[in-house]
Structures are given as C-alpha cells and as structure tokens.
Design a protein with these regions (language model features):
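Conserved N-terminal subdomain of the carbohydrate kinase-like
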Residues: 49-132
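Hydrophobic beta-strand scaffold residues
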Residues: 50, 76, 159-161, 192
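Catalytic-core regions built around general acid/base machinery
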Residues: 143-156, 179-187
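A short helix->loop->beta-strand "cap" motif at the edges of active sites that frequently abuts
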Residues: 151-158, 230-235
Length: 235
C-alpha cells in the first residue's frame, strides 16, 4: 500500500438533530471533518499509510479531533498545535441544507510552513493531496500550500489537487484567488474538478454556452476538462 500525505483544515461541525433549524435546536450533533481529512480517513481505511498535516489549537477539542483521526489509522504526529467549526443544518423536503462557516482566524490560517518538516514528511511518500480550499483561506495558507507542493515535487512525490470550489469561501478578491490557484497548478500532477470548478477556481472558460451556463453532461465535462489538462500539463 502507498504512503500518502494530505494537508488541510479539520473542523468541528455542529448539526441540529434531525431536520431542525439552528434557531429551533437546543442541542447539536458533533462531527469532525474537512475535505483533506476525509480523504485521509478514507485512504487509511483502505489500508494505506496516511499522514495528515494541519494545525489545531492546543485544547481538548483539538485533541478530540486528533483522536477521531487516529481511530481510523491516520498518522497525526505532524499536526502542529496552536478545529475551527462549520455548522450544518440538514435540509427537509424542499428546504436545502444550510452551512455556516466560522473559519476566520482559525489555527491553520496562521500556520507557517516552517512549522512542518517537509523533508521528513515526504520521505518515502508516494502521493501528496491538498484541495483548493486551503490556499485561499489566508496569505499564510497560500504560502504553506505552495511550499508543501514544491517540497513534494523535490522529493519526487506525485501531487494531487482537488479544486473543490466553495461559494462561501470565494466572496472576496476572486481574481487574486484564481491567479493563486492557477500558479499552483504548475506543481500539480493530478487535478480533480469539473467545468464549474475550472471556471470558478482557475478563471478558465471557453466561449461555449453549455460551459458557461453549467451544463455538466459527461461529454461537455470531458471536452473542456481535457483542454484544461492540456493547458496545465496534468498527468
């Protein structure tokens, strides 16, 4: 089995039980997760040797998050100490689910690349996975992601990047964030996403009504994502 490294933010999610609204709830269900943490857990459960990189506060909630990952077999020794939370309200009938993010000034947004020994972390690793969520959280996470990708390439590690567009995290400086992610693509071997992700995260679009309007049929996705692959040189 492969040695895999993932990096991102793990959050505490509070969900009202059943289909209650936040205003109706007097208690909440607790879950820990995040895009890259979920990948780490899934791969660990498949038997891979998985290391998760993040930064969390030094308190009981942070330790509970780490314990949750460890129970699934994820190696957490390289997590820096310093969970933020996202709150999810389940939809009912025609009412959609609602998510409230509380990520401002979270631990990872203040993480420095110097807090992680990437030479040791990537020693013997075969795959490094990160998502488009992490670099757009702050200037610090943008630098952290760039250095992590650079170090992974120096060690001959295959790099994997999930564009993972999130509307609520892309409310300011859209052009700047698109340039940031586009620049990071030079370090990426494998990229996950669809035409919407490419348009929103990379600023990539073609003069095609189906593309711009978001017709994500297999043939449309295949055509445009092949063009994206060629443009950025993905494997």
């Amino acid at each position: 089995m492969a040695k895999v490294v993932t990096m991102g933010e793990i959050m505490l999610r509070l969900s009202p039980p059943g289909y209650q609204r936040f205003a109706q709830a007097s208690e909440f269900e607790i879950n820990y997760g995040g895009a890259e943490a979920n990948v780490a857990v899934s791969l660990a459960q498949l038997g891979h040797d998985v290391t998760y990189i993040s930064k969390i506060p030094s308190n009981a909630i942070g330790e509970a998050a780490i314990a949750t990952l460890k129970k699934t077999g994820v190696d957490c020794r390289d997590i820096a100490r310093a969970v933020r939370q996202s709150d999810k309200e389940n939809g009912a009938s025609v009412r959609p689910s609602s998510v409230v993010y509380d990520r401002a000034d979270s631990s990872i947004t203040q993480a420095s690349a110097e807090e992680f020994d990437f030479d040791q972390i990537f020693d013997g690793a075969e795959l490094f996975h990160v998502s488009g969520i992490t670099p757009v959280l702050s200037e610090e996470t943008a630098r952290l992601t760039r250095i992590a990708l650079q170090k992974a390439k120096e060690h001959g590690v295959t790099t994997s990047f999930d564009l993972n567009y999130r509307t609520k995290l892309w409310t300011e400086d859209i052009t700047g964030k698109q340039k940031l992610l586009s620049d990071l693509m030079s370090y990426v071997d494998i990229c996950f996403g669809n035409t919407r992700d490419a348009a929103k995260c990379l600023g990539y679009a073609e003069k095609d009504k189906n593309f711009i309007d978001g017709d994500y049929s297999i043939c449309v996705d295949e055509k445009h994502m092949e063009n994206v692959r060629e443009r950025y040189g993905f494997t």
